């Protein structure tokens, strides 16, 4: 096939201007379970689907991460790459605090992770990051939500979905999202979007959520009981 010589080397563009290895990495994201971020008038809510095996013991979410006291993240794709990016982001955030004596901005974290992804698109001997990250939080600029992908792109959103069947969730969010949505209604909206994208239509064991409220600027995991309330309200809509 004509593309064969171009999809083996990450540093070589095809004649039609494509980097096949980067495109394959983006396909990896599409195979991951769905993750969603929503900006509300009083905070940010981030959630992810985490399917668990019957005998699996999991005390902490595997696809939700705390980067700083005011910054959270969710991942879709190759999760070990996400852990590597989060570790780097945590170190970057702490270094920023030491150097500038202020909390890092949400966009600065998103740009840093996007820059890291971009580096892995231009050097031979390394593969692209196989993960997309939703970065959200509250800083002096307000409530902010960003998406990074394996190409090194980062974009700000009001609401975003990534992972398997994210097109269904995105279409739903496009239709139902409102600028003045409350944090609680955002939780209900996100739960409804996850049910649309997931093949699991009952229960909430597969849904994990976190939030950063505007008034506290503190990352916190949402309890299973509260997630169940969101899910119940979502099914009544």
Write out the residue ranges for each language-model feature:
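Long, low-complexity N-terminal extensions
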Residues: 1-237
């Amino acid at each position: 096939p004509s593309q064969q010589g171009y999809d083996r080397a990450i540093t070589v563009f095809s004649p039609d201007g494509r980097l096949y290895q980067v495109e394959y990495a983006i396909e990896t994201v599409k195979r991951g379970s769905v993750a969603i971020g929503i900006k509300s008038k009083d905070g940010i809510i981030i959630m992810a689907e985490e399917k668990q095996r019957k005998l699996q013991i999991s005390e902490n979410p595997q696809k939700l991460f705390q980067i700083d006291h005011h910054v959270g993240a969710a991942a879709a794709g190759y999760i070990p790459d996400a852990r590597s990016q989060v570790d780097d982001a945590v170190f970057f955030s702490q270094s920023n605090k030491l150097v500038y004596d202020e909390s890092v901005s949400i966009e600065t974290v998103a740009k840093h992770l996007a820059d890291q992804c971009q580096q892995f698109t231009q050097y031979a001997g390394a593969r692209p990051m196989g993960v997309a990250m939703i970065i959200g939080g509250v800083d002096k600029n307000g409530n902010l939500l960003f998406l990074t992908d394996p190409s090194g792109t980062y974009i700000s959103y009001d609401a975003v979905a990534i992972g398997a069947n994210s097109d269904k969730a995105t279409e739903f969010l496009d239709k139902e999202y409102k600028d003045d949505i409350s944090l609680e209604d955002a939780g209900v909206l996100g739960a409804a979007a996850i049910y649309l994208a997931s093949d699991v239509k009952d229960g909430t064991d597969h849904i994990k959520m976190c939030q950063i409220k505007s008034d506290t600027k503190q990352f916190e995991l949402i309890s299973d009981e509260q997630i169940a309330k969101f899910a119940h309200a979502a099914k009544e809509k």
